[in-house]
């Protein structure tokens, strides 16, 4: 039975039914003066009943999918729609709200586009020729804060044509601000031009075409600052990353070969089949020691919406799925096991759902919090779609943070952007300061997490750390921790005083493993690691652009210029990292600001840092050494250190670290 509010001035409501939102088969099924209607001849699949209610030229659309998922999720079904319907709508959104330009970079709009399984003999590819950037390619253009997901069990269940992410800087040649978009669980049949930088995730994909991949912008001068790619199979050709500064690729299969695949400074390939051979820029790593893939939404054989939660795997090589099977994991019923959150839901509603034993699926939107989301039970999951944002609002009611997770087994936090318009201690914290549980059998997973400080707010804010990991056995799979280097507000010294945040990440837990860590522009140590037996596979960093002068930006009692991008405390006895880059861009200073070391670590036999790189992109200042006073300065170009362990460098001075304190935590209700 349908019901709707009164609208239109007079006459009956004319009711038409179609099999999907953009269906070509809408037919009139009734006309009534009432505000309700019972369809006695509905389609058998309850999700294949969309009703258009029309009166006096005004029309509304009702469906169960819209009732469950809200207005920011769009579903496509080739059983009922023309092949070009999805592409045309997505591209119209891309154009209408400026997603190709700087205005789109700061929009509060969020969208997710979900494709139902291919109908036999049909795909979502409207056909086309040429590279994805060409108008003749008929590509889907995916913009800011948008997500594409396949609702099949395996990527080949949903076949798309060409995909393009259009850069908006330097006439389309510069993708260094092409942020905040994602794709998963689909096949791309033609050109896949994923021309992106940070906070962009492409997972669980099948790339069937001969794809130029990252450099398809019609120019030889392209550059980008990506990126992250995982659990994907290239079936036809080895792609090329072109002018990417760096990239992290995990558990991906490429056609045979060992040749270079583009990129400039720091390309890490972990658990991949047929990666490039090792050289200065390329770091192939044989296996992924421990990983759990990100959960995802799909439609099961019974026609119901489910969430697949992949299992933990150790020492993995290649993808987690096959052409016929989803892979190892568990299936959860969305309506029975999950609370589906919609924009406007409050922290009270979200926390009540968690207390009731529900996991939370965040539909795309902007979630304003007056108190943190408190994840306080084993195996709880927070899963965002469409770059859903959980936000500290400027009301100052929430001075604690966006998400606090307790020291519990199996917690998953995925696909969320933490934003701040107010001062706080953290944006996200995992485990209290007294966390000491052993989670080795069922670790905590953080995946596709973005923390953003500044960029849009006009008031002064102060945050101690974007993220603090106190629990042991946490696995992080793709973070961008970002104190904004640009935005809608005035920069320079004003930004240094307005957007204050000391640390991007503080790790106090033991046996923490991080893949694809991006941390930029924080005002002190960008990554501060205090725990033992940690592992870091890939780091990308730029120091703050806007330190006014050297006196305002020095560490270790003023004895050291600036702060290292990655700081292992002197007491740490064991750590292993591979593939770390820090790049100087001191453009907002007095012209005399330098950083002494890209990285700092204790001289200990079991502290091993491999494949470190520093260079200068812009501005007069330099990074003066790679690590611990050795490796050379960016004043004379790119500098690299292949291995540092118990090395020849000078161990940093001992220091006490200013850590956030427990008194700032909220009262647990």
Annotate each predicted stretch with a short phrase.
Residues 39-59:
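Beta-strand-rich modules
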Residues 8-9, 19-23, 154:
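Acidic glycine-/aspartate-rich tracts in secreted/extracellular proteins
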Residues 7, 38, 62-64:
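Disordered, low-complexity "stalk" and linker segments at domain junctions of extracellular
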Residues 14-46:
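Recognizes extended acidic, P/S/T-rich segments that occur
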Residues 61-669:
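Extracellular/periplasmic carbohydrate-active domains that bind, remodel
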Residues 9, 33, 43-45, 354, ...:
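Short loop/turn positions at the edges of beta-strands in beta-sheet-rich folds
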